[in-house]
A protein has these predicted regions:
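Phosphate/diphosphate ligand-binding glycine-rich loop within oxidoreductases
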Residues: 55-158
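Positively charged, low-complexity intrinsically disordered leader regions
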Residues: 1-75
């Protein structure tokens, strides 16, 4: 248990401010914030390897949007979501109203009602994925500000 306490101490002693912040580009984060993320990952790994529950959620959805093919990332996101107690729902743009002109704002708010996190993998074209994810983040912020969403889900660049 000392190992776990070490991770928690490291997290508490960082000068990281990650609450309600998305990590879309790692180079936009401070070294302290990245250290905090790595310590959180180590703490979760410790708990899992010692058969201690890591469920943070009783229920909730983790939405995944993959705009290009992926195996490792898709299953890593699903496993991490499950580890925290979330059910994964894949968003297939071809089977949604996105294909018929629904805006990013409409889609982002619609899929966010019971979602805790939205994971997006979009790296087919340099810079385009980050621009899309930033637009989704702005739409979520606006949805929360206008009272459309009770809470804003986290946004993760996969």
């Amino acid at each position: 248990m000392k190992e776990f306490e070490h991770y928690i101490s490291n997290i508490k002693n960082t000068d990281a401010s990650l609450f309600q912040k998305d990590i879309l580009l790692t180079w936009e984060r401070s070294v302290e914030e990245l250290k905090a993320v790595l310590n959180i990952a180590d703490a979760l790994k410790y708990l899992h390897s010692n058969n201690i529950s890591t469920r943070l959620f009783e229920s909730g959805i983790a939405v995944s949007l993959f705009r290009d093919n992926s195996t490792r990332t898709r299953f890593s996101f699903a496993s991490a979501s499950n580890l925290l107690g979330l059910s994964v729902q894949d968003l297939d743009e071809g089977k949604s109203q996105i294909a018929h002109g629904e805006t990013v704002r409409e889609t982002a708010n619609m899929i966010s009602f019971l979602s805790e996190v939205i994971g997006i993998r979009d790296d087919m074209y340099l810079g385009a994925g980050n621009a899309f994810m930033s637009e989704v983040g702005e739409a979520l912020d606006l949805g929360k500000e206008e009272g459309v969403l009770n809470q804003r889900p986290a946004l993760v660049n996969l």
